[in-house]
């Protein structure tokens, strides 16, 4: 039994080493951009915000890292610099979202899908991979703003972010 246990533990160690190497090889900014681009194409997105943060103080509780991907309009207004200005005809903005269309709903395809729709489940899985790569690359206290610009190109901007 001891030999089997050691063999199993060695196998686990070997697999963990392989996973670490794969992450080092494939968890890159370029591949993160590819996954974000795939998410935008698959779900016809207009804008998302990716936020990872660790609080400096949590009222005695452990300060644990969290990360989220936001695509609802209310969340984007909170986490995306200037997102709420895209409707203002007098403000210069970079978003493709049309000023002339007050009925425009951001990320409408994804927001209109029922929660149990398989496409939404696939979106959550892809979003989880994006969050994992973002955390691996940027660790914590980051914000990534992604949007389709007026020319129809995907823009990705990362900045430091502190939620305290």
Where in the sequence are the language-model features?
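Acidic interaction surfaces
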Residues: 2-164
